[in-house]
Regions:
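Active-site catalytic microenvironments for nucleophilic, acid-base chemistry
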Residues: 28, 60, 167-170
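Short phosphate-binding loop-to-helix
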Residues: 1-40, 48-52, 56
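A short acidic, often aromatic-flanked loop/helix-cap motif at beta-alpha or helix-coil junctions
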Residues: 10-14, 75-77, 150-153
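Conserved core of the sugar-phosphate nucleotidyltransferase
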Residues: 20, 24, 47-138, 146
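Conserved beta-strand segments of alpha/beta enzyme cores
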Residues: 3, 141-143
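Hydrophobic helical membrane-anchoring modules
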Residues: 130, 144-174
Length: 174
């Protein structure tokens, strides 16, 4: 039996963090007797998340970690290459102030960095209840699970959808 739970008006705003909605839903379900140790927030905009990734994240949560998120390797838009652009004169300068970014001539020399893929945010129910909209609520020691390029596809724009459709056909995904 599927039960529809509508967002209350205070959570139905454009800038409402999704974690606020997840927290509200988990608490409301707990009031009805559906209590869970963990809550997995799996983005529908990341349609290629693998079952084995979800199972791996659940195992990590069961080992006592209170937050596990999916990460992707930063390849092309590396933070060391980020620039600030002066719109008046079109001059640009490095965004990072405390790093000598000019010494990293080749991208292979750049430090290996990761960012959240947006696919999965998994938290203990205890941690989720503490969410206060002042940070991402990742706990003191968040754990990252690196996903491949296909799993990291996140559909936010039309071009992302077109790319996901192309990859789906090319690799016969789902």
């Amino acid at each position: 039996k599927i039960q529809l739970m509508k967002r209350p008006k205070f959570l139905a705003k454009d800038k409402t963090p999704l974690t606020s909605v997840v927290k509200y839903s988990a608490i409301e379900l707990a009031k009805k007797g559906y209590v869970s140790d963990f809550v997995l927030q799996i983005a529908p905009t990341c349609p290629f998340i693998k079952i084995k990734t979800i199972k791996h994240i659940i195992k990590l949560l069961k080992k006592g970690n209170d937050c596990v998120v999916t990460l992707k390797k930063i390849e092309h838009e590396h933070p060391y290459r980020a620039k600030e652009l002066n719109k008046k004169n079109l001059q640009f300068k490095s965004f990072l102030k405390n790093v000598d970014v000019e010494k990293f001539i080749s991208r292979q020399d750049l430090p290996k960095l990761f960012c959240t893929s947006g696919g999965i945010y998994a938290r203990s129910f205890t941690l989720l209840k503490k969410f206060n909209e002042k940070d991402f609520n990742l706990g003191k020691k968040p754990i990252g699970v690196v996903v491949d390029d296909i799993e990291a596809i996140n559909i936010d724009r039309l071009i992302d959808f077109d790319f996901a459709e192309l990859m789906s056909k090319k690799y016969k995904l789902r």
